[in-house]
Amino acid sequence: MEFRGDAYKRIAMISAHLQPSFTPQMEAKNSVMGLESCRAKGGNPGFKVAILGAAGGIGQSLSLLMKMNPLVSLLHLYDVVNAPGVTADVSHMDTGAVVRGFLGAKQLEDALTGMDLVIIPAGVPRKPGMTRDDLFKINAGIVRTLCEGVAKCCPNAIVNLISNPVNSTVAIAAEVFKKAGTYDPKKLLGVTTLDVARANTFVAEVLGLDPREVDVPVVGGHAGVTILPLLSQVKPPSSFTPSEIEYLTNRIQNGGTEVVEAKAGAGSATLSMAYAAAKFADACLRGLRGDANVIECSFVASQVTELAFFATKVRLGRTGAEEVFQLGPLNEYERVGLEKAKEELAGSIQKGVDFIRK
């Protein structure tokens, strides 16, 4: 079979990235056309995005959604298993982003080199009866290894950390970056967007509104009582009865458990988490592009409280979280909830710090 011009080289290059045995040396041998050679004709330059844990429950759906994002020009999909299959599947979508797959520890550095945004959903999922802290022993080591790769290969990338428990893994990542001398607190972002999405959805149900018209600030952390919806600051301005406040707060805090139990051992909140992760990643990319007033909630290094990390609204820009907003006025219910959240968060953050320092 004959191909015109450089078509054969392009096809060979793309095919190489669908094979688990791919190496940079193979790319150099198969093509002299460079990294951008198989970008869609006429496509915008866009950004280079890596998903670490792309073959997992969250990762597969997230890979699909990021392939659809017009701001992505190059999408690297990394995992320790099944990365070639996910890469092949997603690569058949006729959108502009070029997809490249990477399999196993030996290819981690290649997956990360030159990335603008790194999204990390890697780790084991929650199962019935498990808390996010039950995941710590396994996921802590995974996050450490991946962040060591980030520090070495793309130290200037913005990192979106999804791996649970986020209240601890963000601290782990920070300590890894500090050891490597690459830590920039503005660029390490714990993803809490699903808490906001749930809050918007559940509040909209109570108010009889479209969730897209509702904005609920959710502060604190990303587990149980550390998730604190500020219902007094809901937009559009609304009032709730004490029973509604109790119902909404409890449901938002336990949204993950609701899904785990509903799936009866068949998984966790992978679909809604992938949606939330893609939404937050898109906000980060718009910030990188220089869009004005890109505001989302995120678990970040913060001086809002005495804790080293705290989830609040942040303004995203070219350097990451360029502004961290204060909490604003709280009612008595929220002030009590804040103290409970801080007490729980302090231990979780310290657990992450100790994992690296001890």
Swiss-Prot record:
The protein's UniProt keywords, in alphabetical order, are: Glyoxylate bypass, Glyoxysome, NAD, Oxidoreductase, Peroxisome, Transit peptide, Tricarboxylic acid cycle
Which of this chain's residues are annotated to bind NAD(+)?
G53, A54, A55, G56, G57, I58, G59, D79, N139, I162, S163, N164, M273
Tell me the active site.
H222 (proton acceptor)
- The superkingdom listed in its UniProt entry is Eukaryota
Keyword Hydrolase assigned: no
> What are its E.C. numbers?
1.1.1.37
The protein's matches in Pfam families, at most eight in alphabetical order, are given as: Ldh_1_C, Ldh_1_N
Q: What is this protein called?
A: Malate dehydrogenase 1, glyoxysomal
Q: Which gene encodes it?
A: MDH1
